[in-house]
């Protein structure tokens, strides 16, 4: 996971705990979760819109001289 070992992750978590305090961690986690949920929702909507636009676009046909006659 990002090239971090167990000791590095524990150190990062301890620093976060010291900076924000134990009482604010659940609130921060909720906010992060909501943000990720909104991001994934927007990503899915954009992908669906893009796929629908591709499906709705008729394939362009190359005209040949025989087609014009």
From Swiss-Prot:
Encoding gene per record: tatA
* Localisation: Cell inner membrane
| Described function | Part of the twin-arginine translocation (Tat) system that transports large folded proteins containing a characteristic twin-arginine motif in their signal peptide across membranes. TatA could form the protein-conducting channel of the Tat system.
For whether the record's keyword set contains GTP-binding, the answer is: no
Task: Report the family membership.
Answer: Belongs to the TatA/E family.
PANTHER family per record: SEC-INDEPENDENT PROTEIN TRANSLOCASE PROTEIN TATA
- Which Gene Ontology molecular function entries are recorded, alphabetically? protein transmembrane transporter activity
Under which name does UniProt file this protein? Sec-independent protein translocase protein TatA
Q: Name one GO biological process term.
A: protein transport by the Tat complex
Which is a Gene Ontology cellular component entry for this protein? TAT protein transport complex
Keywords, sorted A to Z: Cell inner membrane, Cell membrane, Membrane, Protein transport, Translocation, Transmembrane, Transmembrane helix, Transport
Which residue ranges traverse the bilayer? 1-21
User: Self-association or partners: how does it assemble?
Assistant: Forms a complex with TatC.
The membrane topology noted for this protein in its Swiss-Prot or TrEMBL record is: Single-pass membrane protein
């Amino acid at each position: 996971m990002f090239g971090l070992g167990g000791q590095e992750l524990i150190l990062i978590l301890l620093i976060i705990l010291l900076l924000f305090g134990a009482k604010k961690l659940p609130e921060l986690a909720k906010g992060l979760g909501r943000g990720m949920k909104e991001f994934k929702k927007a990503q899915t909507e954009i992908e669906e819109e893009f796929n629908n636009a591709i499906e709705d676009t008729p394939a362009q046909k190359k005209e040949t001289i025989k087609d014009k006659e």
